[in-house]
UniProtKB/Swiss-Prot annotation:
Residues on Extracellular side: 1-616
Active-site residues from the entry: S57, D352, H355
Reactions catalysed, as given in the entry: N-acetyl-9-O-acetylneuraminate + H2O = N-acetylneuraminate + acetate + H(+); N-acetyl-4-O-acetylneuraminate + H2O = N-acetylneuraminate + acetate + H(+)
Region (Esterase domain-2) residue spans: 297-351
Domain of life: Viruses
Subcellular location: Virion membrane; Host cell membrane
Protein name: Hemagglutinin-esterase-fusion glycoprotein
Phylogenetic placement of the source organism: Viruses, Riboviria, Orthornavirae, Negarnaviricota, Polyploviricotina
Organism for this UniProt entry: Influenza C virus (strain C/Kyoto/41/1982)
Protein family membership: Belongs to the influenza type C/coronaviruses hemagglutinin-esterase family.
Region of interest: Fusion domain-2: 352-637
Pfam families: Hema_esterase (PF03996), Hema_HEFG (PF02710), Hema_stalk (PF08720)
Keywords, comma-separated and alphabetical: Disulfide bond, Fusion of virus membrane with host endosomal membrane, Fusion of virus membrane with host membrane, Glycoprotein, Hemagglutinin, Host cell membrane, Host membrane, Host-virus interaction, Hydrolase, Membrane, Transmembrane, Transmembrane helix, Viral attachment to host cell, Viral envelope protein, Viral penetration into host cytoplasm, Virion, Virus entry into host cell
Topology relative to the membrane: Single-pass type I membrane protein
Transmembrane intervals: 617-637
Length: 641
């Protein structure tokens, strides 16, 4: 007796239909192309080999109480340049009796966890009761220059020329000593004949190199005394006070000149010292000061200005019973590109009240790892391009964009059944897939024509079923990826130009950045919708091809025992080919001809420039689908007589 045996697609109400370009799919399950990720609080780095830290006892592995005294792991401590009791500002000014450490090192990303050792608790005077405002200005300049440099170093001995009549001086309010920078020089005068002394003229040189460190820019403390009135300074009738720094061309670059600037007008009778932070290029500079007193720059921090990179500043405060300042916090928040790590609770140490805080350890634990994105909101190492909430800038790396979960396209999963057809739901997408409205002029927009996706599918369409070839879909992936790269590059240029135009308005930059991010998210979701449709169509075609491959294999196995009368259907004589024979042909010796479908291997990798500020996302698309490995599920063997 002859019977007809066919491969038949079986789809029931549990399947959902997914439309694609060139073919559709029925599937038992579906999943979002990406899940939303949540940033982890604290600090991390993009690359373990390209960062360096600057710290104090809380990162100092030579501390006798390490690791209990530390807020970082042993691995992270190895990345820090630290000394117990030290701070960048202490090394800059060198107050008597304090730790003086040579801070220097190189790294694209710099993490600063120091500053607490110069705080109100330190009670440093030297003609200034409160140094917090100077510390704020110092830290801000350090963060700014560090973000533009690969290497930085303290220069702890500048070449100088001091006038013969000046000798090193001391001050009673500075432990009967004085700062190492600036150094105090005084003139010995003999009233009444030489009651005023001579004007001071001194020179110092900022080097182009310090050891192995190149110096293209120096941070210098321009210090001078502030008198409340001329009478306070001019008790001997010696004219007005001045202390001025000049560059080699004679231009004033720092200091104070009471010959042209008014005194404070306050009622005090003791001068205070002010130190302005100035950024100077290498070269020879002169210092002129009124007789009797000279404050001479003797140190600087030098920067090579060779590479832009992230800066992370970690809140540096004492535990209970010690007074702290928040200069580090304020300096970082007012410096573009600086990410601030802050505690939510008071500092509570394990080794003592001031060392080994558990909350800070958790916030800094991310320094042991590499992240895909670091930002003020935290760090992310998942590959998803979407997060539930907008990540606060600054941010660097491949940072996810804010999106709603329901807006992320879904792709078919589980049991997949192909069906011919053309997607009718996405043939008219939005007229452009990227845009940040009319604020940005001249951006490249990708137009989507009504007939399809405007040249992305380059192959010829099959007349039967209206689908596209596998090759054309693959070319579509390549072309859409290339076009989006061009789009992102053009956007980069436009954004950078706009940033330059409105750089004076920080709020405008923040507003524009948020708008751009929202547009990027919408654009990416639109792009993913197109990619999803391409994926569905490509898989559908591939599965149908696999069906024909399966039918061909059955025909080959059957030989003369079965005659293929149409694709997927055979006539067989069961008097000649019994059940075991049929099992051999159609079930491969009782082995199911339809093994479980492997997981859909799709990857969409979003890439960006190494750093967030002024950059634009780039989109690299790979859709690696092993068509040869996909075997049709949901196929039944149907017998009819």
């Amino acid at each position: 007796e002859k019977i007809k045996i066919c491969l038949q697609k079986q789809v029931n109400s549990s399947f959902s239909l997914h439309n694609g370009f060139g073919g559709n799919l029925y599937a038992t399950e579906e999943k979002r192309m990406f899940e939303l990720v949540k940033p982890k609080a604290g600090a991390s780095v993009l690359n373990q080999s390209t960062w360096i830290g600057f710290g104090d006892s809380r990162t100092d592995k030579s501390n006798p109480n390490f690791p209990r005294s530390a807020d970082v792991s042993v691995k992270t401590a190895n990345k820090f340049r630290s000394l117990t009791g030290g701070s960048l500002m202490l090394s800059m000014f060198g107050p008597p009796g304090k730790v003086d450490y040579l801070y220097q090192g190189c790294g694209k990303h710099k993490v600063f966890y120091e500053g607490v050792n110069w705080s109100p608790h330190a009670a440093i005077d030297c003609y200034r009761k409160n140094w917090t405002d100077i510390k704020l200005n110092f830290q801000k300049n350090i963060y700014e220059l560090a973000s533009q440099s690969h290497c930085m170093s303290l220069v702890n001995a500048l070449d100088k020329t001091i006038p013969l009549q000046a000798t090193a001086g001391v001050a009673g309010n500075c432990n009967n000593s004085f700062l190492k920078n600036p150094a105090l020089y005084t003139q010995k005068v003999t009233p009444p004949x030489x009651k005023c002394g001579k004007e001071n003229l001194a020179f110092f040189t900022l080097p182009t190199q310090f050891g192995t460190y190149e110096c293209r820019l120096h941070l210098v403390a321009s210090c001078y005394f502030i008198y409340d009135s001329k009478e306070v300074y001019n008790k001997r009738g010696c004219d007005n006070y001045f202390q001025v720094i000049y560059d080699s061309s004679g231009k004033v670059v720092g200091g104070l000149d009471n010959r042209v600037s008014p005194y404070t007008g306050n009622s005090g009778d003791t001068p205070t010292m002010q130190c302005d932070m100035i950024q100077l290029k290498p070269g020879r500079y002169s210092v002129r000061s009124s007789p009797r007193f000279l404050l001479m720059p003797e140190r600087s921090y030098c920067f090579d200005m060779k590479e832009k990179g992230p800066v992370t500043a970690v809140q540096s405060i004492w535990g209970k019973d010690r007074k702290s300042d928040y200069a580090v916090d304020q300096a970082c928040l007012s410096t573009p590109g600086c990410m601030l790590i802050q505690k939510q609770k008071p500092y509570t140490g394990e080794a003592d009240d001031h060392h080994g805080d558990q909350e800070m350890r958790e916030l800094l634990s991310g320094l042991d790892y590499e992240a895909r994105c670091i930002s003020q909101s935290g760090w992310v190492n998942e590959t998803s391009p979407f997060t539930e909430e907008y990540l606060l800038p600054p941010k660097f790396g491949r940072c996810p964009l804010a999106a709603k979960e329901e807006s992320i396209p879904k792709i078919p999963d589980g049991l997949l059944i192909p069906t011919s057809g053309t997607d009718t739901t996405v043939t008219k997408p939005k007229s452009r897939i990227f845009g940040i409205d009319d604020l940005i002029i001249g951006l490249l927009f990708v137009a989507i024509v009504e007939a399809g996706i405007g040249g992305y599918l380059l192959g010829s369409r099959k007349e039967s079923g209206g689908g596209v070839t596998k090759e054309s879909a693959e070319k579509g992936f390549e072309k859409i990826g290339n076009d989006i790269q061009i789009l992102r590059s053009s956007t980069n240029i436009a954004i950078e130009k706009l940033n330059d135009r409105i750089s004076h308005d920080e709020q405008a930059i923040r507003d524009l950045t948020l708008e751009i991010e929202n547009a990027r998210s919408e654009a990416l979701l639109g792009e993913l919708g197109i990619i999803r449709a391409l994926l569905v169509g490509n898989i559908s075609i591939g599965l149908q091809e696999s069906l024909w491959e399966l039918a061909s294999e059955i025909t080959n196995r059957a030989g003369d025992l079965a005659v293929e009368i149409s694709p997927g259907c055979w006539i067989i004589d069961n008097n000649i080919c019994d059940q075991s024979c049929q099992n051999f042909i159609f079930k491969f010796n009782e082995t199911a001809p339809v093994p479980t479908i492997p997981p859909l291997d799709t990857k969409i990798d979003l890439q960006s420039d190494p750093f967030y500020w002024g950059s634009s996302l780039g989109l690299a698309i790979t859709a690696a689908i092993s068509l040869a490995a996909l075997v049709i599920s949901g196929i039944a063997i149907c017998r009819t007589k």
